[in-house]
Amino acid sequence: MLRRKARRLIACLVMVVPWLIWLSAAAPAQTLERIAATKTIRIGYVPDQAPFAMPGPDGKPTGYAIDLCSQVVARIGQTVPGLSTDYTQLKLADAFASLAAGQVDLLCSALTITLKRREIVDFSQPIFVTGASALLRSDSPQDLRELFLGEHKISPPRSPSLHPFAVSRVGVRKGSSTEAALSKAIDAGKYSAVIVPYGTHAEGLAALEDRDIDAYFADRALLIGLLERFPDSSNLILGTRLLTRESYGIALRRGDSDLRLLVDRTLSAFYATAGFGALLRKYFGPEAGQLEQQIVAQSAIE
């Protein structure tokens, strides 16, 4: 009796499991079909990532990554008349899970492409090239100032040149790729530095001003944007040396190859226009020329 039940259970699993696998693989491919049927594309963004994604004066999101995603929306709109955009604010800690669960179709913010993140989502070709650096006070420990403001090259993690990490409290955005890189560097060197995670960049900058930490780490492009919007940044100095080198991308659901191809084609076409240089100048000023060369050099071709 038990054997017959076991055989029936196995037979059911043999029939059901392949169907479930097909269903999970087929679901992402239906994103463009759903967009066409509902005439709505759902874009998620992290609101405190100026100048990549931030609330505008009218409450609607704006920023470099948002504008690039608008190019994608316009491309889809060529075949879907009356297409509307539904924006959703997300916390960085929840953003990738929300995308994987199908709550949004695209993530448009300052999103570093990492292998760990690619376990649950896919990314477009790079939309930006940057790296993590430090924001310091004018009276931050001298060793930290020499390391990130000096002329010498940053040494490998185990080098004595990273000794200042051993006596410092350093802040970082919780859940960011910079947090992972900073933790790895400190662990590799067996330093006793304290990493203090913050929920938002604004909290981290406030802690730096209040001397709760000696330095705040984030992608350099984000730090530039934060300095421009911080009420009193005269006492803060942006590091010129990079701890990491990273690329940003637009995030999509894993396996959503049709939408990813459309996004990549849209980006490559836009990179070849004068409008791309104008967009970079709008958000990054004099650094636009160098940024354009770096991004275009990594772009996909037809």
Segments the model singles out, each with a brief description of its role:
Residues A11-W22:
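Bacterial N-terminal signal peptides
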Residues L23-A29:
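Sec/Tat signal peptide C-region and signal peptidase I cleavage site
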Residues A29-L115, E119, S155, P197:
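Extracytoplasmic small-molecule ligand-binding "clamshell" domains
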Residues Q30-L32, Q78, G82-Y87, T112, ...:
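A conserved helix-loop-strand patch within extracytoplasmic ligand-binding domains
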Residues A36, K153-I186, S234-L236, L267-E302:
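Ligand-binding clefts/hinges and TM-proximal coupling segments of bilobed small-molecule sensing domains
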Residues P47-D48, F128-D143, R220-A221, L227-L267, ...:
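Periplasmic-binding protein-like
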Residues V72, L99-A100, L208-E209, I250, ...:
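Hydrophobic residues within well-ordered alpha-helices
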Residues D94, C108-I120, A181-A188, A202, ...:
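A ligand-binding cleft/hinge motif common to bilobed small-molecule-binding domains
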